[in-house]
């Protein structure tokens, strides 16, 4: 095969959609950039989805905006077999068509530009497109959607197809791909359920063990009972005789005079009132009970009367002196 034949490429397009015949045209590659026109087979009796197209994948280098010199090396490793099977809804007059193509291109472009240097070679990519869409000259490989048919067997193997699909879907940089996998992997994992330990539980205070009195708890179980002196009890009894209920100012005054605190004076008056009510219920006291203070007052008044009666009056003493003189 001569160089002129190697530097040319084949363009297959179906001319007649009814008979399914294909015609091939050869073009001479001047710039070294190969373009492929998509071809489709559509029968009048078939559905709208019956479209057949060949997906190709090649290895390209990014073309610069200005081209000065291109060196293209084309190799034809083997022929790519493409077979089209007739749709079951089609008539019997359209048999299966098959033809062989010889442009499974694997080439490299060495380009010289006016810029800082050459462009790195990109990974193989597959560009999906429609059947009648215009393909840019920069897109060296493309693939179409296949409705119902057979995919052609690529000579590069399944591994290269997987790499091409992965490169087409994701970014061409492998660093970006690994970073994306690292970012997506933690979100896929579900966090384990939180485990509750004994030390995390709330510890509540135990109930009070003190004896409940008649009117609730008398205080903390370790509280020492107050022992009042005779003088303190006497002053408290005197105050209770005049006022059964104390104001806060009077309570503070009595506590300061008896060297007690307000709580002790308050509790004593509460207990004294309850004791008085209990005595009234039992009938030990009359309706107008005599308090020790009143009894002391009556005794004082009686003593005063006796003392005044025992002492002689001035009138009697004068009369006695007159009788003695007469």
Curated annotation (Swiss-Prot):
Residues 285-296 have a biased composition (Polar residues). SMART domains: HOX (SM00389). One of its GO terms (cellular component) is nucleus. Residues 306-326 have a biased composition (Low complexity). It comes from the Eukaryota. A motif (Antp-type hexapeptide) lies at residues 196-201. This is Homeobox protein Hox-A1.
